[in-house]
Structure formats: structure tokens, C-alpha cells
Swiss-Prot record:
GTP binds at residues 30-37, 94-98, 148-151. Residues 73-77 are annotated as: G2. Residues 30-37 are annotated as: G1. This is Elongation factor G-like protein. The lineage of its organism: Bacteria, Bacillati, Actinomycetota, Actinomycetes, Mycobacteriales. Disulfide bonds: none annotated. Residues 21-289 form the tr-type G domain.
Length: 714
């Protein structure tokens, strides 16, 4: 292999690749608590980057360095740690397993070319991990399965393997079997024992012969089925012994193609299986040159020819994560897809979310284009940044103080700006209303939210113009908790969560007349305005109409707009429960004026009073927003989801089959019933369901629900 790595032992100096052939970008995914972060510690020790592993419980791991991660003892963000093994640089991308932080997981998948699905021997496979496997299958991403926590009191390797095969398919086959303090290689038929950080080789015990032969036969048949040599299976079934080197070669090709998925058992606490896993990562997983690049466009949206993953190609890189630190400033984690990044050069920064996603994120991620100068380059080892002289195609690096770059932005040559189509961002669907605890902190809150939005595309910030609330749209309660925690600890802003107000509206159920009289004459210049109006309801979406039918100049011409202004002001305030009035026609019929005391203000007040009197004379109904939702749910949970939708006053529009034993349910549900649906649906379907929502229309709220709202308003 031409591209090799300049490697130094220890954490101070980073391994440096000469080209993309010497790089492997590997993302670790799987359930929360499966041992991904601890596995990275063990791999760093095996590669002699660390002398001893850190501990999640003690808050000393390389990848869980954020204050929230240390406190919660779980990953909440993406982190990268690199090592060198057998002349190859391996970038290990640690991702959270908890569903609230799926945005970090998506970024990790974008940064990597292959994936390790990490499953704990005492837990098995959860539904979100099954769904993620299917997504990786659709794009042909190479994968391997790692079964961890072999030393756990409730560990059962055989059950975990069966669960993985049931979930992921029959091409998931073990390369090794756990045995005491080591592993048995099924192709080599050797026992690899670990002691004091060293691996020794010896012959397995005779008692293991039967299970070795059974597993070895299944493995060999699985490899041969994926072989490009069609005669190999016939020769094998005919009794020919296939050379181990041939099997290994075919195995590596099948793994790189994403058609065969080896299983490696690992015990992170003892190091068992770490060297075997590194061998799979460096020999079986493909380099970035074999992984297709994302779609490329010009800033004007014109498709561009695909670039090669080559050091000498035009620069094309992407910001996969952004962090802000009070001391070091903004740091951008960047995956280089083509070209080479060097310090003290100017690159073009492009952000075009709305061009690809219809403006859905433009309020917090506006489109932008500007040139910026590259400052310090480094290779990350968790939060530690190790200096880099240059970063080649296929590698991952950190760039300090790119002031305008946000997560998802593209870096390219300023002479030929390009834009990578961003990866699909999951839509945040849990609304949390907040307010600064102290009014003096409102400016700091605004700054902090702006910076967090630049870092996290799954955080949407809404300034609701109807309810006048600041609403954080998050992925779940844990995500919201991390956001609020960061605001407090990083930006010094104490934030209160307040009751979320759904933007209801009011309208008239029937015709009504109202008399407005605003007269104050107690000496000096007084106030005098009287008007009579009629209010009629209009069809939904008609808005507001104002008609003038005054005869004989009862209301002077210059004060007719004043009456309309007063009516509009009262409509904004509401006439019954404090919500805006919509879809009415107001006709000015009559009125009275005074030659001295009448004024614009007096007739505004009269118009407002007339509308309120008309409202008291008829029935005013509340209108609530209705959303159309689409729920993707495993077939096993369809009944539970349908029952829950019914309890939320939902109307099911239909169901359809989505494949992979899943169903899509379409329904219309009042927004007020959806405020916690992101949390409740996860509980109903064990984290395996997802949904989207879009506004449909306003419609009358049932009396029982409206009564509760009116009681609260009172």
C-alpha cells in the first residue's frame, strides 16, 4: 500500500497519513450503555496511544469530556480519537447511543466510511439499532459487529450473537469465539490469550473442538458464498480444503463491499479482542477512496461532477461538528473529502441548508457564503488537539476559529466554490418554552442560543410571534436538558422552562352588533367617540374585512380608520380567552362625534369597546391548529399507536405498508395534543418509531377542551 502513516507512540503526537489510502474512518454506533466509549479506550491502549484506559464512571475517558457527559456518565456528543495500527491511521468516531442525540450520530455517519455496531453481551439489540442497520444497508456501508462486556455478570455471548443475527441477517458471522481469557480464531484455529496487555498464541483445548468446527464451517460457507470465484463453493463441497489465505482475501473483499459482516467479541477491561478488531478495521474496512462522495453542487445549485478522493484534487471538505469554548473559541471538526487543507490558506465557506431542505432550517441556519482564512490545524484526540502540518484527502481534523462556519457547511477552494448536499438532519419535534430567569440575562440568552444553534442543527429556535414565547425545538427531554445545562455552565444564563402556549385563535360563531362609547368630559379637552358595528363570521382563512356603511357623516371621515384601528387592536388581544380574533367582517353602521372632543384615540377606544360588546352578545369559539402527522412504526406497535392517537382526539386518515415489517400511519391531530408526542411515541414503540408533522389548518376546538383553556385564561 502506497499511503502509509507516520506514527508516534503516545497521545502527544498524532499519526499522520500521507494519502487517503492510509486512512480508515470508523464510526461506533449502537445502544446507549453498550460500551462504545470504553471500547475506544481499550483500542487506544492496544495501539499504545494511552498507557492505561480511562473510566466512564470517573469521567476520565478521552471521548466523554463534556461536563454534561461526565455528570451523566453517557455520551451526548460526537468525538474523534485517532490511532495508528499496521501502518494505517484509524479515526475512531464515537457517537451517542441515546435517541435524543441522533443528530450527533448522523454527523458521525457522515464523517465515516464504515461502522462498528457495538452490542453489549448482557443487553442485545434495541429497535433503533435495527433501524440504523437497515439505513446502512441501503447505502452499502461496510459494517462489523462488536460484542462487548464479555466479563459482565449477566453476559451471554451466544444469546447476544443470536440476537445480532436475528436483527441483522445471516451474513453476520463470528470470526472468533470467546474462550476464557482469550479468543479462538475460527480461520486460524488458534487460541489468542491476553495477559498484562500482551497477546500470546497457543492451541485450543480439545473440549473446544466441536464448537470450533461448527462455527468454522458456517464461517467458511458464508465467506465462499460471497467469493467472486464461483468455483470455490463447488470445490469446498467436493471436500477440497480451501487455503486460509484465500479465505482471508475473500473475507476482506466482502467486508469492504458491505456484503459480509464479521463479529468480533471484545472485553474492553482486559483488552481481549482489541488487536483482532484493529486488524479487521485496517485490513477489512475500505479506505476513503473506495467510499462514494456526497453529491456536489455549485452555490447556485447546479450539479457538479463528482470529485476524486485525492490529495491533489480540488478542496472539498465539510464541517461535521462545531463547538464553542469560552477560552479557545470556535472549533470546527472537519472531514476532508478531496484535496488537502493547509494552515494560512483561504477557503470558501458555504452554508445552503434552505436550498436543499426548503427553508426548514433557515431561521437558525441562514444561507451564507464567505471566504475565511485557515488558522491552526490539529488532529483531535477527544478534546486534546494535536498539531497538524497538513490534512490530506479522506482524513478528519479540527480547525480553530472559523468564525462563520457552522455544522453542515462546506469548505472549498475560493476560486471554485462548491457545496456538498448536507446530510439529512432529523427534525426536532419536542417544543420547550423558556425565558431568562433574570431580565438582565436576556441578551446573554440570545447570544448563547445563537451559538448553540450554529453548533447543533437538531436544535431549532423559534420566536413565536403569536404567543410571544421563545421556544426550543429539541429531539427529546435529554437533549433539552443538555441545551439548558450548556446555557447555564458555558454562557452563565439561568433559564426557566415555562408552560408552552399553543397559538389558538378566536372567531365569532354568529352575527352580533356592538355599541362602543368612549366619552370623558370633565373640563378641558375631553374624549368623545361613539360607534355602532355589526360583526359577521367569515369562512376559514378569509382574514378580516372592514366595511364603512355610515350615512350622513355620523362618524367624520377622518375617524373611520380610527374605528378600524381600534377593532384590529382588540382582535389582536382577543375578546374571550386572550387569543387573536380571525375570519370576521366588521361593518361600521353609525356613530356620534363631538366637534371639539372627538379624536383618533377616542374612536380607537370606541371601536375596541364595540367589538367586545358584540362578542358578549354572541358565541365566541376557540380555533385550534391541526397538524397532519405521519408515523413510521414497527407492525408490532401499530395497535398501541392507533389507540394513543385516538386518545389525543386524532383522526386517522389511513395506513400503508412501508416494508421491513413497518407501517406508516397518517393522521390529523390537534397541536395542543402533540406537545409531548416525541416523548410518548418513543415510550409506546420502545424507541423504534418516528414521526413528521406539518400544519394543516385551524378548526373549532371541542367545548370540553375549550372550557379548560378558558378556565386557564381566567
Amino acid at each position: 500500500m502506497a499511503d502509509r502513516v507516520n506514527a508516534s507512540q503516545g497521545a502527544a503526537a498524532a499519526p499522520t497519513a500521507n494519502g487517503p489510502g492510509g486512512v480508515r474512518n470508523v464510526v461506533l454506533v449502537g445502544p446507549s450503555g453498550g460500551g462504545k466509549t470504553t471500547l475506544i479506550e481499550a483500542l487506544l491502549v492496544a495501539a499504545k496511544v494511552l498507557s492505561r484506559p480511562g473510566s466512564v464512571t470517573e469521567g476520565t475517558t478521552v471521548c466523554d469530556f463534556d461536563e454534561a457527559e461526565i455528570r451523566q456518565q453517557r455520551s451526548v456528543g460526537l468525538a474523534v480519537a485517532s490511532l495508528a495500527y499496521d501502518g494505517i491511521k484509524v479515526n475512531l468516531v464515537d457517537t451517542p447511543g441515546y435517541a435524543d442525540f441522533v443528530g450527533e450520530l448522523r454527523a458521525g455517519l457522515r464523517a465515516a466510511d464504515c461502522a462498528l455496531f457495538v452490542i453489549a453481551a448482557n443487553e442485545g439489540v434495541d429497535e433503533p439499532t435495527k433501524s440504523l442497520w437497515q439505513e446502512c444497508s441501503q447505502v452499502g456501508m461496510p459494517r462489523a459487529v462488536v460484542i462487548t462486556k464479555l466479563d459482565h455478570a449477566r453476559a451471554n455471548y451466544r444469546e447476544a450473537l443470536t440476537a445480532a443475527q436475528d436483527a441483522f441477517g445471516d451474513k453476520v458471522l463470528p470470526l472468533y469465539l470467546p474462550s476464557g481469557d482469550g479468543l479462538i480464531g475460527l480461520l486460524s484455529q488458534a487460541l489468542y490469550e491476553y495477559a498484562d496487555g500482551k497477546r500470546t498464541t497457543r492451541t485450543p483445548a480439545e473440549s473446544d473442538t466441536e464448537r470450533i468446527e461448527e462455527a468454522r464451517g458456517a464461517l467458511i460457507e458464508g465467506i465462499i458464498e460471497e467469493s467472486e470465484d464461483e468455483s470455490l463453493m463447488e470445490r469446498y463441497l467436493g471436500g477440497e480444503t480451501i487455503d486460509e489465505s484465500v479465505l482471508i482475501q475473500d473475507l476482506e473483499k466482502a467486508v469492504a463491499r458491505g456484503s459480509f459482516f464479521p463479529v468480533i467479541p471484545v472485553c474492553s477491561s482486559t483488552g481481549v479482542g482489541t488487536l483482532e478488531l484493529l486488524e479487521v478495521a485496517t485490513r477489512g474496512f475500505p479506505s476513503p477512496m473506495e467510499h462514494p462522495l456526497p453529491e456536489v453542487f455549485t452555490p447556485q445549485g447546479v450539479p457538479h461532477a463528482e470529485l476524486a478522493c485525492d490529495n491533489d484534487a480540488p478542496l472539498l471538505a465539510e464541517v461535521v461538528k462545531t463547538t464553542s469554548d469560552p477560552y479557545v473559541g470556535r472549533v470546527s471538526l472537519v472531514r476532508v473529502f478531496s484535496g488537502t487543507i493547509r494552515p494560512d490558506t483561504t477557503v470558501h465557506v458555504s452554508g445552503h441548508f434552505s436550498s436543499f431542505f426548503g427553508g426548514g432550517t433557515s431561521n437558525t441556519h441562514p444561507d451564507h457564503d464567505e471566504d475565511e482564512r485557515i488558522g491552526v490545524l490539529s488532529f483531535p484526540l477527544g478534546k486534546q488537539q494535536r498539531p497538524a502540518a497538513a490534512v490530506v484527502a479522506g482524513d478528519i481534523c479540527a480547525i480553530g476559529k472559523l468564525s462563520r462556519a457552522e455544522t453542515g457547511d462546506t469548505l472549498s477552494d475560493k476560486a471554485e466554490p462548491l457545496v456538498l448536499k448536507p446530510w439529512t438532519m432529523p427534525e426536532p419535534l419536542l417544543p420547550i418554552a423558556i425565558a431568562a430567569h433574570a431580565k438582565t440575562d436576556e441578551d446573554k440568552l440570545s447570544v448563547g442560543l445563537g451559538r448553540l444553534a450554529a453548533e447543533d442543527p437538531t436544535l431549532r429556535i423559534e420566536q413565536n410571534q403569536e404567543t410571544h414565547q421563545v421556544v426550543l425545538w429539541c429531539m427529546g427531554e435529554a437533549h433539552a436538558g443538555v441545551v439548558l445545562d450548556t446555557l447555564a455552565n458555558r454562557y452563565g444564563v439561568s433559564v426557566d422552562t415555562i408552560e408552552l402556549r399553543v397559538p389558538l385563535r378566536e372567531t365569532f360563531a354568529g352575527n352580533a352588533k356592538g355599541h362602543g362609547r368612549h366619552i370623558k368630559q370633565s373640563g378641558g379637552h375631553g374624549q368623545y367617540g361613539v360607534c355602532d358595528i355589526e360583526v359577521e363570521p367569515l369562512p376559514e382563512g378569509s382574514g378580516f374585512e372592514f366595511l364603512d356603511k355610515v350615512v350622513g357623516g355620523a362618524v367624520p371621515r377622518q375617524f373611520i380608520p380610527s374605528v378600524e384601528k381600534g377593532v384590529r387592536a382588540q382582535m389582536d388581544k382577543g375578546v374571550h380567552a386572550g387569543y387573536p380574533v380571525v375570519d370576521i367582517r366588521v361593518t361600521l353602521l353609525d356613530g356620534k362625534a363631538h366637534s371639539v372632543d372627538s379624536s383618533d384615540f377616542a374612536f380607537q377606544m370606541a371601536g375596541a369597546l364595540a367589538l367586545r360588546e358584540a362578542a358578549a352578545a354572541t358565541k365566541v369559539i376557540l380555533l385550534e391548529p391541526i397538524d397532519e402527522i405521519s408515523v413510521l412504526v414497527p407492525d408490532d406497535f401499530v395497535g398501541a399507536v392507533l389507540g394513543d392517537l385516538s386518545s389525543r382526539r386524532g383522526r386517522v386518515l389511513g395506513t400503508e405498508t412501508a416494508g421491513h415489517d413497518r407501517t406508516v400511519i397518517k393522521a390529523e391531530v390537534p397541536q395542543v395534543e402533540l406537545t409531548r408526542y416525541a416523548i410518548d411515541l418513543r415510550s409506546l414503540a420502545h424507541g423504534a418509531a418516528s414521526f413528521t408533522r406539518s400544519f394543516a389548518r385551524y378548526e373549532p376546538m371541542p367545548e370540553s377542551a375549550a372550557a379548560r383553556v378558558k378556565a386557564g385564561a381566567g
